[in-house]
UniProtKB/Swiss-Prot annotation:
Keywords: DNA-binding. It comes from the Bacteria. GO terms for molecular function: DNA binding. PANTHER family: MU-LIKE PROPHAGE FLUMU PROTEIN C. The keyword DNA-binding applies. Belongs to the c/mor transcriptional regulatory family. InterPro entries: c-mor_Regulatory_Protein, Homeodomain-like_sf, Mor_transcription_activator. Regulates pectin lyase production in response to DNA damage. It comes from Pectobacterium carotovorum subsp. carotovorum. Residues 82-102 bind DNA. This is DNA-binding protein RdgB.
Length: 117
């Protein structure tokens, strides 16, 4: 199926997903737009049809993933004295900053202990 045919006859989810893939490929690589479209439409869409065809697919909102990314960013910015500034910047409570720092320190310590064992 050519690209225009795929856009007009492809299932809506696959068409939209393949366009997002093409846009992402264009953004993160130096591929020309036509090649990026080929990757998204021809390769990715066909692969998804083969792998997940006929299945109901659920895409989580990624709330816990985004929160863990935010927590890591907070911990990296933490300097021992900027609890309040971080709470304001990330729109969380001061207690939440303390909890994040405590949790991240514990995880860091466990990781060090496992590498030394």
């Amino acid at each position: 199926m050519t690209e225009p045919q795929f856009r007009s006859k492809g299932p809506e989810l696959l068409v939209e997903l393949s366009q997002h893939v093409a846009d992402t490929v264009k953004t993160v690589t130096e591929l020309d737009p036509q090649t990026a479209e080929l990757v998204g439409n021809a390769r990715f869409a066909k692969h998804m049809m083969t792998v997940w065809g006929g299945q109901n697919v659920y895409f989580p909102m990624g709330i816990s993933w985004r929160a863990s990314q935010r927590d890591l960013q907070i911990y990296e910015e933490f300097d021992g004295r900027n609890h309040s500034a971080l709470a304001k910047k990330y729109n969380v409570s001061l207690q939440w900053i303390y909890k994040i720092v405590r949790t991240m320190r514990k995880e860091e310590l466990l990781a060090k202990q496992h590498t030394q064992a």
